[in-house]
């Protein structure tokens, strides 16, 4: 008598139509948010490193130009 209701409950829990538990939804939301944050941080780090490299390259080019000719150097007073 008790086996049939238990069997039905187990079938409902194991069926693919059963909704995800709340904890699983929260975990998937947190994982998705963490991945989005990681992507944004990587983009910011890449852009800042590129801009930093461009500044360094510009200084090197300016120093080389100043050593060759004084026309590209800033006037020193």
Curated annotation (Swiss-Prot):
Task: Kindly list the places in or outside the cell where this protein is found, as annotated in its UniProt entry.
Answer: Secreted
Modification comment: Contains 2 disulfide bonds that can be either 'C1-C3, C2-C4' or 'C1-C4, C2-C3', since these disulfide connectivities have been observed for conotoxins with cysteine framework V (for examples, see AC P0DQQ7 and AC P81755).
Q: Describe tissue expression.
A: Expressed by the venom duct.
Q: Does the keyword Disulfide bond apply?
A: yes
Proregion positions? 20-44
Family, similarity comment: Belongs to the conotoxin T superfamily.
Indicate what this protein is called per its UniProt record. Conotoxin Ar5.1 a
> Where does this protein come from, organism-wise?
Conus arenatus
Q: Which GO terms describe its molecular function?
A: ion channel inhibitor activity; toxin activity
Q: Which keywords are on file for this protein?
A: Disulfide bond, Neurotoxin, Secreted, Signal, Toxin
- Source organism superkingdom: Eukaryota
Its signal peptide is 1-19
Name the InterPro entries on file: Conotoxin (IPR004214)
Q: What phylogenetic lineage does the species belong to?
A: Eukaryota, Metazoa, Spiralia, Lophotrochozoa, Mollusca
**Domain description:** The cysteine framework is V (CC-CC).
Q: Which Pfam families match?
A: Conotoxin
Keyword Kinase set for record: no
Entry GO terms, CC: extracellular region
